[in-house]
Amino acid sequence: MKIALITDTHWGARNDSQVFTDYFTDFYDNVFFPYIDDHDIDTIVHLGDIVDRRKFISYVTLRSFRDHFVQPMADRNINFHCIVGNHDIPYRNTNDINAMREIFGSSVGKIYWETQEASFDGLKILMMPWINNTNYNSAINKMEQTDAQVMFGH
C-alpha cells in the first residue's frame, strides 16, 4: 500500500474565485494525479479542509471538485480517507454536520468526524478531526488510550 497525504485544499477559496479554481484544477490534472499514477499510489488521506466555505458550497465548486478530484479517484479505484477539518463544518462546536458526509454519505471512502483508529496494512493510525467543545474530552481520551504510534489530524 502506498499512501498520499493531502490537506487544506479549500475548494471554493476566495469566494469561489475562478483564478483559484483554475490553479487547483491545474494542480490535480497536471501534478497530483500524474504523481499518483507514476508512483502506484492506491490510497489518499485528506487531512481536512477539503472545502473553504463553512456555511455553503456553490454548485460550480462542487462540479469542479467532482470533476478534478472525486472522479479521478474513482477512475483509479483509489481508497479514500478524509478527516473533517474546521472549514468542512458549518458550526464550530460540532463535527456531526460536515460537508463530506452531507455531500457523499457513505458512498465515497471513509470520513472521520470523530476520533478513531484506522488500519493501513496493519499499521494503526489515530485519525483526529477538528477538535471542538463537543468532541474535546472524547478526543483526549482516545489519544491517551490508543496504542497507535502515528496520528493524522487537522
Task: Go through the PLM ranges and name each one.
Residues 39-43, 121-154:
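His/acidic metal-ligating clusters that form di-metal
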Residues 1-2, 149:
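Short, conserved structural micro-motifs that define repeat-unit consensus positions
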Residues 7-8, 130:
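Conserved donor-binding loops in enzymes that form glycosidic bonds
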